[in-house]
């Protein structure tokens, strides 16, 4: 599915002929993704993986020689979801992997800044996520049980990242992210040392392709 390509959507002139604010993002694939009206036809996994591997979690305030990327975070969340629900089906796992995919366009807005600006960003985020879901054969709106699993796994990942990488004390992390999750030594070994951008991009794409193959 990720190999299928359609021609990039043309950039249409605005009515009135004058200059206007640009609301689309040009991708390395050649796509132009309109943030106001995103089309599933303009979503490509190569752009998602490339972008997420270069977007920093925690505003870059993490330990290590490399940023802790949204791509690596997404793989951690998916691993925690699999550990919590071992029988989670392929579509469920794919939805978990893609839960932060809109950030390849809009970046990772930290929670304190979200509190400052309010909920205005959410409409853009929701439109982008719906287009991404449709592109890869998922429902635009996920079932509530799956949404809850994603939220729980995301909070568990945030706790681990906060205490291992972002300098939080255990008590402070519990206050913001809840009780620490149960996880294996393999999860800490495999997902909590920041990777290079190239490695994060490759591993994200490999996991995506594996899920597509079933």
Describe the function of each predicted region.
Residues 2-5, 19-214:
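Metal-dependent phosphohydrolase cores
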Residues 9-18:
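Short, low-complexity intrinsically disordered segments enriched in A/P/G/S/L with frequent Arg
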